[in-house]
A protein has these predicted regions:
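A residue-level marker of the well-folded mature domains of exported/periplasmic proteins
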Residues: 2-9, 23-24, 29-242
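Hydrophobic alpha-helical membrane-insertion segments, chiefly the h-region
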Residues: 15-25
Length: 242
């Protein structure tokens, strides 16, 4: 993930996590017992992936640092989108967590179901389309920064072909891909943007192979929307702007 998106994700998690700060001391019995408010994050990849999940974990650590002993944070990593999400959520609730951050789009169905089942727990989705009384969605206009990165990519390409590695064809990713392509065309009219779908949020090997394929097809500048830094690392190793 590029540095702009990494910083944006970290900032957004910190902003969204203020919900935990507001809840400290307001949960039933918390003020009397002095018990720390428990907050949990669920990651689709490893917490130190060098990209999306790591940005969220930096947000978690910032919350822990800001609130100190008032909050106890935890995380579950490498949770695949599917039935396992519900199991992880239920486990976190049994452990006493009162706010849960789901950081992958595919966690949404399980998060929404859990929100209905546990009205006393708060749920925060990083990107999503479902809002409930105790479930919110947080994100920002990432396409603005991605449009600017597209302008930079268009200005840097000499071959007139820019490559872009993307995960899933969901609205958010399509919006970001369009923004990148429009940015390329803004600074380099007539330039082409070639994309490869990895159909995975975090798959370093797939992302590297996609970058190799785009490079072989003539793309001399590469961008990415996946979670790991693999595409960027390949680009850097081969002297391509990224």
């Amino acid at each position: 993930m590029n540095k702009t998106k990494l910083a944006l994700a970290a900032i957004l998690v910190v902003i969204a996590a203020t919900a935990a700060a507001l809840a400290v001391g307001t949960a039933p019995g918390s003020a009397k017992s002095g018990a720390a408010f428990k907050a949990a994050w669920i990651y689709v990849g490893p917490h130190n992936d060098g990209g999306w999940s790591q940005a969220h974990d930096q947000g978690r650590l910032a919350v822990q640092k800001a609130l100190g002993s008032k909050v106890q944070t935890t995380y579950k990593e490498n949770v695949p989108e599917g039935p396992q999400v519900s199991q992880v959520i239920e486990s976190l609730i049994r452990d006493g967590n009162k706010i849960i951050f789901g950081t992958s789009f595919g966690f949404q169905p399980a998060m929404a179901a859990a929100a209905k089942k546990h009205p006393d727990v708060k749920f925060e989705m990083a990107t999503g389309t479902i809002i409930q009384k105790n479930m919110a969605e947080y994100y920002g206009a990432g396409e603005d920064a991605i449009y600017l990165s597209g302008i930079a990519a268009g200005a840097a390409t000499k071959s007139g072909t820019v490559g872009y590695v993307v995960p899933f064809a969901i609205p958010e990713v399509i919006r970001h891909t369009n923004a990148f392509a429009l940015g390329v065309q803004k600074s380099h009219p007539g330039a082409k943007v070639k994309i490869i779908w990895t159909n995975s949020w975090f798959a370093p090997d797939k992302e590297k192979k996609a970058a190799e394929s785009l490079h072989s097809s003539g793309a001399d500048v590469l961008g990415q929307n996946d979670d790991s830094p693999s595409a960027g690392q390949f680009s850097e190793a081969n002297g391509n702007p990224r």
